[in-house]
C-alpha cells in the first residue's frame, strides 16, 4: 500500500533524482500505421498499466485488455497489430493497492465527452484539400484581431446559417450568409471579409468539461475555460460528438474556410488549469502536472481549483508539445494564453523558440494575459507584466493599462475612462499611443508586445460599460448618440495606437449583454451575436471598417521597432485634448508621408492648431472613410468635433 502524502509527492516530483530518472524525450500518444499502432503513456508512478479496447466512443463492452510494457524514464508501451483506425481505448492504471481508468492525455481524437480516446488515421478523416491549406500571409501592418466564441458566432437564427450548422465549426465554412437570408446584409464569414479583420481569435476550442456533449445544447452554454483534453477539438461544436473523427474534420474545415478568406486563426489556449482535479492529467500521474503548496495541496492561482506546473520538466514538455501539435496539425496562426502569469518565463521563451523553428513559425503570433487569477505557488519568474523585460520580444501581453485609460476600470462598472470624461486619464492615453515604450510604468521591448484593446469576453461589453457609467438603469437596446460617439472615440484611439489592435466580436455594432459582466455560463441567447444589430448600427460598423482599412496605410503604427514610438511628437494642447504626429516616414507602403491625430473627449467643438503644411482630413470622428475619396485639405488650424478622434495625413 502506498502511504505517500501530497507533500511527499511534491518533494519527490521536485527532486533532481526524479527529473533525471523520469524525463522522457521520445514520442508519446498514438503512433498509427495501417499495419499496426504503438501506444505510449508516460506514467512513472504506476505499477501496472493496461489498455482497454472498445468499438464505440461510448457504451458497449470492452473487447480486449492488454498489458503495457514498462520501459525506462516512466514510459509504458504496447503494440496493437492490424489496422486500428476508429478503435477507442482507455488505460487502467494500478498503483498503491488501487486501480483506476483514464483516457490518454496525449490523445488526438475521442468519443463523446472525451471519456474514451480514439486511434485515428488523419489521412482518412481530414477534409478534402486540407493538405493544400496554408496560413495566409498577413503583413504586420494589416494585423487586427476579432475575438469570438464558436457558438456565439452563428447561434442567432437571423444569421442565415443553415439550422444544423448554427453554433458549430461548420458555420464558419458557409459562404454568402446574410441577415434572414435576405441576400443584402452580410453575416458571419461574409461579414468578416467585408469588415476587414485579419485574425479571428477563437475562444477555447479544445475539449472542455462544462458542456455535456451527449445532451441537447438548447439550455447548455459555457465559454469553455475548463479544459478536459488539450489536444482534441471540442465535440459540442461538431455536428456529431459521438464519432471522434467528426470534430477533427469539421474543426479543420472551419480553419480552412477562414484561411481561404485570408483570415488567420488564433487559438485561445487554457493550459493554466484543468476542469476539476479528477482530470486526464491527474489520472495519468497524480499530483505531477499541477503546482502544489508547501503542504502538498493544489495551488489555486487560476481560481479554478488547480494550476498547471509549467516548471516541472514533463509538464513543460506537455505544454510545448501540445501547442506545436496545434500549429502543425491544425495550421493555427497564433496562440492567446489565458492567465499567462501562471506560466514561468523560461517555458514561454522555450515555446516561442520552438514555434520559430516551424516553417513560417516566426509569423505565428503569441500573446497572453499577464496576470493570475489568484495567489500562486509559482515562486520563480512568472510570465507577467512585472517580468515583461524577461519575455521574448515577440511574446505580447494584453495591456489593461490602455483598456482602463480609455474606458475606465473593469472592476468598477461606474468608473469612467478618458472617453467618458476622465480628464486625468489623458497622460495614460499618451503613453498608450506609443505602446508604453516611453513610459516607465510598463516598458516593453517594442510596440509589438502590446495588445491594445478596450473589450474582450471578460467583463462588460464596451457598449454596456459606456451606458452603465452614465445611467443608473440603462436601456441597452436603445440607440444612444452619446454612447455612440464615445464608442467611436474609443475605437479611434486604440486603432491609432501602436501595437496590435484587438476587440471583442460585436463591439463594432454596440454588442450588449444587458449589463451581464460575466456571461461565461449565461444563456445562449444572451451570449450570441445579434446580427440584426449589425444592420441597426451599420454606421458604427462602417466606422470600424474605415479605421481598419486606414490603419493599414500607416505601417509604422504596427512597427516592431523601438525607433517608431520615439518618433512620435506630442502637441501642447488644452486639457483634456490629446494630439500627436508622426512627422515623417510612416512606413513602407504608407499613402501619406506624415500622420496627425487628435482626441477630443469633451462634448464641445475644439479648435486646435495644425502642424505646418497642408493636411488631408482622413477621418473626422463620424466618418472614418473620408480617406477613400477627395476630402478636405486643411492648414493652420482645424475644428475637432465633440467626442471624436480626428485623423489627418500629409501628402
What kind of region is each of these model predictions?
Residues 41, 91, 148, 202, ...:
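Conserved, mostly hydrophobic/aromatic
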Amino acid at each position: 500500500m502506498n502511504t505517500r502524502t501530497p507533500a511527499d509527492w511534491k518533494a519527490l516530483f521536485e527532486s533532481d533524482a526524479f527529473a533525471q530518472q523520469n524525463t522522457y524525450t521520445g514520442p508519446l500518444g498514438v503512433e498509427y500505421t495501417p499495419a499496426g499502432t504503438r501506444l505510449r503513456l508516460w506514467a512513472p508512478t504506476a505499477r501496472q498499466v493496461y489498455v482497454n479496447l472498445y468499438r464505440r466512443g461510448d457504451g458497449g463492452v470492452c473487447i480486449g485488455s492488454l498489458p503495457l510494457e514498462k520501459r525506462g524514464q516512466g514510459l509504458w508501451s504496447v503494440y496493437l497489430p492490424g489496422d486500428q483506425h476508429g478503435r477507442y481505448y482507455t488505460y487502467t492504471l494500478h498503483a498503491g493497492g488501487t486501480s483506476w481508468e483514464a483516457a490518454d492525455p496525449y490523445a488526438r481524437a475521442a468519443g463523446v465527452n472525451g471519456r474514451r480516446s480514439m486511434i485515428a488515421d488523419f489521412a482518412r478523416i481530414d477534409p478534402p484539400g486540407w493538405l493544400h491549406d496554408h496560413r495566409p500571409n498577413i503583413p504586420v501592418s494589416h494585423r487586427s484581431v476579432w475575438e469570438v466564441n464558436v457558438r456565439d458566432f452563428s447561434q442567432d437564427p437571423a444569421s442565415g446559417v443553415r439550422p444544423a450548422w448554427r453554433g458549430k465549426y461548420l458555420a464558419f465554412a458557409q459562404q454568402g450568409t446574410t441577415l434572414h437570408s435576405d441576400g443584402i446584409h452580410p453575416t458571419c464569414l461574409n461579414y468578416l471579409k467585408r469588415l476587414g479583420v485579419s485574425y479571428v481569435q477563437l475562444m477555447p476550442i479544445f475539449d472542455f468539461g462544462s458542456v455535456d456533449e451527449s445532451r441537447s445544447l438548447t439550455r447548455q452554454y459555457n465559454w469553455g475555460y475548463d479544459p478536459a483534453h488539450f489536444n482534441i477539438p471540442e465535440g459540442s461544436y461538431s455536428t456529431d460528438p459521438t464519432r471522434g473523427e467528426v470534430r477533427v474534420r469539421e474543426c479543420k474545415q472551419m480553419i480552412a474556410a477562414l484561411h481561404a478568406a485570408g483570415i488567420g486563426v488564433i487559438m485561445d489556449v487554457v493550459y493554466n488549469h484543468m476542469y476539476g482535479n479528477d482530470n486526464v492529467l491527474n489520472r495519468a500521474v497524480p499530483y505531477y502536472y499541477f503546482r502544489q503548496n508547501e503542504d502538498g495541496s493544489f495551488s489555486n492561482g487560476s481560481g479554478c481549483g488547480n494550476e498547471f506546473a509549467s516548471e516541472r520538466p514533463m509538464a513543460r514538455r506537455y505544454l510545448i508539445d501540445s501547442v506545436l501539435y496545434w500549429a502543425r496539425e491544425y495550421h493555427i496562426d497564433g496562440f492567446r494564453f489565458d492567465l499567462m502569469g501562471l506560466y514561468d518565463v523560461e517555458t514561454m521563451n522555450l515555446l516561442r523558440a520552438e514555434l520559430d523553428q516551424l516553417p513560417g513559425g516566426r509569423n505565428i503570433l503569441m500573446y497572453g494575459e499577464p496576470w493570475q487569477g489568484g495567489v500562486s505557488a509559482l515562486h520563480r519568474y512568472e510570465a507577467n507584466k512585472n517580468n515583461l523585460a524577461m519575455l521574448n520580444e515577440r511574446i505580447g501581453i494584453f495591456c489593461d493599462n490602455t483598456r482602463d485609460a480609455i474606458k475606465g476600470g473593469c472592476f468598477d462598472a461606474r468608473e469612467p475612462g478618458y472617453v467618458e470624461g476622465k480628464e486625468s486619464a489623458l497622460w495614460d492615453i499618451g503613453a498608450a499611443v506609443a505602446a508604453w515604450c516611453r513610459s516607465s510604468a510598463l516598458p516593453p521591448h517594442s510596440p509589438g508586445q502590446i495588445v491594445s484593446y478596450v473589450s474582450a469576453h471578460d467583463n462588460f461589453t464596451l457598449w454596456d460599460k459606456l451606458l452603465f457609467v452614465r445611467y443608473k438603469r440603462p436601456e441597452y437596446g436603445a440607440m444612444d448618440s452619446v454612447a455612440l460617439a464615445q464608442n467611436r472615440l474609443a475605437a479611434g484611439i486604440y486603432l491609432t495606437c501602436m501595437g496590435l489592435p484587438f476587440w471583442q466580436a460585436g463591439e463594432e455594432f454596440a454588442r450588449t449583454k444587458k449589463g451581464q459582466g460575466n456571461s461565461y455560463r449565461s444563456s445562449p441567447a444572451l451570449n450570441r451575436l445579434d446580427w440584426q444589430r449589425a444592420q441597426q448600427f451599420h454606421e458604427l460598423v462602417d466606422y470600424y471598417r474605415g479605421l481598419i482599412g486606414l490603419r493599414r496605410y500607416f505601417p509604422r503604427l504596427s512597427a516592431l521597432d523601438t525607433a517608431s514610438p520615439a518618433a512620435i511628437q506630442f502637441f501642447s494642447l488644452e486639457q483634456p485634448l490629446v494630439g500627436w504626429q508622426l512627422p515623417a516616414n510612416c512606413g513602407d507602403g504608407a499613402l501619406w508621408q506624415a500622420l496627425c491625430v487628435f482626441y477630443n473627449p469633451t462634448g464641445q467643438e475644439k479648435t486646435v492648431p495644425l502642424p505646418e503644411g497642408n493636411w488631408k482630413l482622413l477621418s473626422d470622428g463620424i466618418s472614418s472613410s473620408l480617406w477613400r475619396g477627395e476630402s478636405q485639405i486643411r492648414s493652420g488650424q482645424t475644428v475637432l468635433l465633440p467626442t471624436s478622434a480626428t485623423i489627418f495625413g500629409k501628402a
